[in-house]
Amino acid sequence: MVGKSVITLDDLSIRQIQEMLHKAQYIDSHRKEVAHTCEGRVLATLFYEPSTRTRLSFETAMLRLGGKVIGFAGAQLASVTKGETIADTLKTVSNYVDVVAIRHPKEGAALVASRAASVPVINAGDGGHMHPTQTLADLATLQSRFGRVTNLTVGLCGDLTFGRTVHSLIETLCRFGNVNFVLISPDELKTPQYVLDRINATESCSYTEVKDLVSVIGDLDVLYMTRVQKERFFNEDDYLRLRDTYILDEAKMAYAKKDMAVLHPLPRVNEIAVEVDDDPRAAYFEQVKNGMLMRMALESSVVGDELPGYEPLAAKEVEA
């Protein structure tokens, strides 16, 4: 993985994803031992779009590994306001750093960045396309809760059209196989056809599209809630009409399995009531921690720094 850019999780083999999960577990239990792993390294966080968790998570990951961070948060703080292209920015920044994390509102921007850069580029979210490191956090949370990421019924609820975390998760779970997806959304926010095609192309996976959450919540092992994203709408009236379509509260949780896990990529608005936070099935703040650990694993891997005392997985590589 040394020197490798990660634009989608298709850039990693199943074996490499499993290795990241294994590394993250090791890091969590060996915080002091890994604290100098990336000494002398510098991460650039180039965020052309607002972010709290993802940017701070990337930065904290490098700092906890002993490295340093430079970057900007908001396109208004970058030379893009002067007309500089992404390619030129990346060619410049590559001279300063060892790895780049980039978020951009345009789909495909991370790929453009990776082709221009001379150091590894990690996609921190490009428009409504992909969000691979959030998916790594999601996988780590499933692994922690269930001991597996397969043989699950996974409900995805809310904005399935623009939700890049949803698209990334579905496509990656299809690679592992044996997942039944329940896609819960209004007609205006249905899952894109290219994502459905990915499910259809996977013999061991299936999907159902429904509009009513309560009618299916009792069948789910995982409920992945998403917010309706105001910034993706051209018409505010459409946003206002759809934003309160799904609100998960204690009443709905009463219909769910006792061991169901509720995930959410955050930030939330009102789609999960605060009263659900104290339910042991709420796993969304656990996802935040797992996101940092997975980014620590990924950053150290792409720059080629070995974790002290870490022993790689011994299993044979799974083709994907």
Curated annotation (Swiss-Prot):
- Does this entry carry the keyword Transferase? yes
Tell me the GO molecular function terms: amino acid binding; aspartate carbamoyltransferase activity
Q: Quick check: keyword Chaperone in the entry?
A: no
Q: What is its pathway? A: Pyrimidine metabolism; UMP biosynthesis via de novo pathway; (S)-dihydroorotate from bicarbonate: step 2/3
Q: What is its EC number?
A: 2.1.3.2
Which positions bind L-aspartate? 82, 164, 227
**Keywords tagged on the record:** Pyrimidine biosynthesis, Transferase
Task: Cite the Gene3D superfamilies for this sequence.
Answer: Aspartate/ornithine carbamoyltransferase
The residues that hold carbamoyl phosphate are 53-54, 103, 131, 134, 266-267
| GO biological process assignments | 'de novo' pyrimidine nucleobase biosynthetic process; 'de novo' UMP biosynthetic process; amino acid metabolic process
Subunit structure, per the record? Heterododecamer (2C3:3R2) of six catalytic PyrB chains organized as two trimers (C3), and six regulatory PyrI chains organized as three dimers (R2).
Its biological purpose is as follows: Catalyzes the condensation of carbamoyl phosphate and aspartate to form carbamoyl aspartate and inorganic phosphate, the committed step in the de novo pyrimidine nucleotide biosynthesis pathway.
Question: Per the similarity annotation, which family is this?
Answer: Belongs to the aspartate/ornithine carbamoyltransferase superfamily. ATCase family.
Protein name (record): Aspartate carbamoyltransferase catalytic subunit
**Gene designation:** pyrB
